[in-house]
């Protein structure tokens, strides 16, 4: 039996309203393109480590450190792997690495997800929906990026979750955009809870497993001359720098940080060493190479579809 993301309707009426009132760009219903990987009747999509669908967050009033280490909320890769953020622990201090998890869909599962996305009717052309800026300040943009059926489409929506689905359109926002908030909110919720509606046959693996990255970006900062961070009475946690390089010369300086932070990429054996190191650390752990100098290290796992290089942050939003 064909299943789709729960609660979705075809939104031709919404698209018509958006197009008529200028609430966002909208195209016609997507063509029936097929012949994709593994299913001649399915929706074509990338294979391997290329991304099919990514849900990310950009902008918002956040520190540059958060901006640099922010991770997508959801990634579906061409090989069926789904990578997302798992449950966060309440312990203090928290673990140094984010709790990323992964599980693999079958081709049937990929098609179930893509069918649900297509049936929203929204992924026909790039759209920016910014009307909520008139009612919510400093919110983030939720960005859906889809590569399927021979198209690459990006939908960016400001303040997703901040617009009640039954509200009258505020100034600067069309009724079509209000409905788009409702539909994309449902889509987002469905993607974050795949287990609740996908059949068992949609999964190649039985359960979620911790995601172990093949590469990480490390943001290293010399904090030797800074006062200790208040750890709530906990003793300072200092570990030995695990490699032979000089922490003070690690990577390249990230000027946009404004505090001497340096960024470099570790992979291969070095990446495995640092993954083990960061897995044993907390958010308050410091590292030393001589007993006197102190360095903070923040790791940002690199996902399979991403360029591992440290990104240029100047002008980011």
Segment roles from a protein language model:
Residues 66-87:
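Short, flexible N-terminal segments of the mature chain
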């Amino acid at each position: 039996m064909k299943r789709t993301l729960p609660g979705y309707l075809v939104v031709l009426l919404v698209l018509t309203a958006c197009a008529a009132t200028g609430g966002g760009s909208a195209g016609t219903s997507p063509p029936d393109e097929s012949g994709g990987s593994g299913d001649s009747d399915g929706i074509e999509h990338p294979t391997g480590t290329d991304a099919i669908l990514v849900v990310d967050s950009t902008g918002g009033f956040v520190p540059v450190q958060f901006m640099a280490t922010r991770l997508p909320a959801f990634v579906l890769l061409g090989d069926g792997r789904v990578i997302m953020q798992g449950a966060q622990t309440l312990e203090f201090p928290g673990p140094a690495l984010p709790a990323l998890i992964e599980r693999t869909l079958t081709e049937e599962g990929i098609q179930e997800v893509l069918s649900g996305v297509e049936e929203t009717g929204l992924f026909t052309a790039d759209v920016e929906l910014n009307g909520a800026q008139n009612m919510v300040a400093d919110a983030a943009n939720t960005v859906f990026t889809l590569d399927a059926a021979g198209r690459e489409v990006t939908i960016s929506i400001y303040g997703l979750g901040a617009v009640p689905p039954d509200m009258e359109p505020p100034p600067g926002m069309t009724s079509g955009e209000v409905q788009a908030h409702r539909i994309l909110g449902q889509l987002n919720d469905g993607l974050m809870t795949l287990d609740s509606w996908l059949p068992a046959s949609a999964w190649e693996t039985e359960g979620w497993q911790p995601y172990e990255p093949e590469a990480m970006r490390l943001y290293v900062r010399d904090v030797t001359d800074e006062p200790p961070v208040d750890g709530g009475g906990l003793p300072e946690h200092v570990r030995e720098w695990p490699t032979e390089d000089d922490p003070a010369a690690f990577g390249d300086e990230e000027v946009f940080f404004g505090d001497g932070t340096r960024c470099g990429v570790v992979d291969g054996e070095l990446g495995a060493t640092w993954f083990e190191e960061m897995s044993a650390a907390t958010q308050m752990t410091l590292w030393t190479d001589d007993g006197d100098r102190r360095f903070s290290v923040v790791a940002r796992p690199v996902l399979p579809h991403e360029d591992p290089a440290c990104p240029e942050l100047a002008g980011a939003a």
